[in-house]
Swiss-Prot record:
One of its GO terms (cellular component) is plasma membrane. It comes from Homo sapiens (Human). J region of the variable domain of immunoglobulin heavy chains that participates in the antigen recognition. Immunoglobulins, also known as antibodies, are membrane-bound or secreted glycoproteins produced by B lymphocytes. In the recognition phase of humoral immunity, the membrane-bound immunoglobulins serve as receptors which, upon binding of a specific antigen, trigger the clonal expansion and differentiation of B lymphocytes into immunoglobulins-secreting plasma cells. This is Immunoglobulin heavy joining 1. It comes from the Eukaryota.
């Protein structure tokens, strides 16, 4: 399982696989 957190265009994107 991986956790990715990145800010872009004022939007928080979180991806968990």
């Amino acid at each position: 399982a991986e956790y990715f957190q990145h800010w872009g265009q004022g939007t928080l994107v979180t991806v968990s696989s």
